[in-house]
C-alpha cells in the first residue's frame, strides 16, 4: 500500500504481522506553490526517449529524474547515488537484520538568483494587467542591471506543482498551455532597439 495511513503503520509496528514491513521513501515538496512552477520544473520517471541516455550514465530504469525546468537542467548535480542494502528475513517473512553494503549519497544543493518575493510581486502585477486586457497569457522577466542575474522569470498562466504531481494530464490539457514557459520558450518581435541604448546610457550615468 502506498501513502499508508498512520493507523495502518501503527498496526504493522505494534502487531508485526508476518510478511509485512514498512518502507520509507522521500518525496519532493513544493513551497511558494505556483509562483515559479515552469522555472523550477518537475521530476518523474525516465521516458522511453531518454532511457538509453540515462542507462549510459548508470541510472536504473526506475530512477526519478528531472523532466523540465531547473530540475532537468541541473539533474547531474541534484541527483545523488543509490546505495545497496542486505536485508535478512526469518522463515515467517519478518526482517531480522539490515546492513548497508554501499551508502547512498544525497545530491548537491543549488541556489538560483531568483528573488521569490519579487517574483510574487510580479505575479500579482501581471495577473492584474492580464485581467485588465482580458487575457490569460503573458510573461515577465527582470534582470539585475549590475550583474545580469535573473531576479524574475514568470510565465502565465501558472499552475500548482503539488497538483501536477498527481494529475499532470489535466495540467497539460489546461487552456492556455500552463506547462509552457513563455519567458524562455516564446518567440516575440523585438521592441525599439534605441530605447535599450538610451536606457543603458541612463543606467551608466546613474
Which stretches of residues belong to each language-model region?
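A short, glycine/Asx- and small/polar-enriched loop/turn
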Residues: 33-34, 145-147
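Conserved protein kinase catalytic core
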Residues: 47, 150, 161
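Glycine- (often His-adjacent) and acidic-residue-rich active-site loop
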Residues: 158-165
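Active-site loop and adjoining helix of the penicillin-binding protein/serine DD-peptidase-beta-lactamase fold
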Residues: 102-146, 153, 165-206
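Short beta->alpha transition motifs characteristic of CBS
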Residues: 43, 152-158
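Small/polar-residue-rich segments within soluble enzyme cores
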Residues: 1-107
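Acidic/polar residues at beta-strand termini and the immediately following turn/coil
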Residues: 90-91, 144, 160, 181
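Residue-level signal for well-ordered, solvent-exposed loop/turn and beta-edge residues enriched
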Residues: 94, 148-149
Amino acid at each position: 500500500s502506498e501513502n499508508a495511513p498512520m493507523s495502518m503503520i501503527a498496526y504493522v509496528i505494534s502487531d508485526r504481522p508476518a510478511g509485512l514491513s514498512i518502507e520509507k521513501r522521500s518525496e519532493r515538496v513544493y513551497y511558494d506553490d505556483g509562483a515559479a512552477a515552469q522555472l523550477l520544473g518537475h521530476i518523474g520517471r525516465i521516458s522511453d526517449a531518454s532511457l538509453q541516455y540515462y542507462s549510459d550514465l548508470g541510472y536504473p530504469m526506475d530512477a526519478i529524474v528531472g523532466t523540465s525546468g531547473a530540475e532537468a537542467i541541473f539533474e547531474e548535480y541534484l541527483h545523488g547515488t543509490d546505495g545497496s542494502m542486505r536485508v535478512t528475513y526469518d522463515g515467517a517473512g519478518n526482517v531480522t537484520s539490515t546492513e548497508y553494503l554501499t551508502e547512498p549519497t544525497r545530491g548537491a544543493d543549488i541556489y538560483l538568483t531568483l528573488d521569490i518575493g519579487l517574483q510574487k510581486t510580479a505575479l500579482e502585477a501581471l495577473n492584474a494587467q492580464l485581467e485588465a486586457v482580458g487575457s490569460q497569457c503573458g510573461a515577465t522577466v527582470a534582470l539585475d542591471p549590475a550583474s545580469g542575474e535573473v531576479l524574475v522569470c514568470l510565465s502565465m498562466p501558472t499552475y500548482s506543482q503539488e497538483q501536477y504531481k498527481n494529475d499532470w494530464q489535466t495540467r497539460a490539457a489546461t487552456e492556455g498551455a500552463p506547462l509552457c514557459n513563455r519567458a524562455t520558450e516564446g518567440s516575440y518581435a523585438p521592441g525599439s532597439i534605441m530605447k535599450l541604448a538610451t536606457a543603458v546610457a541612463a543606467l551608466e550615468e546613474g
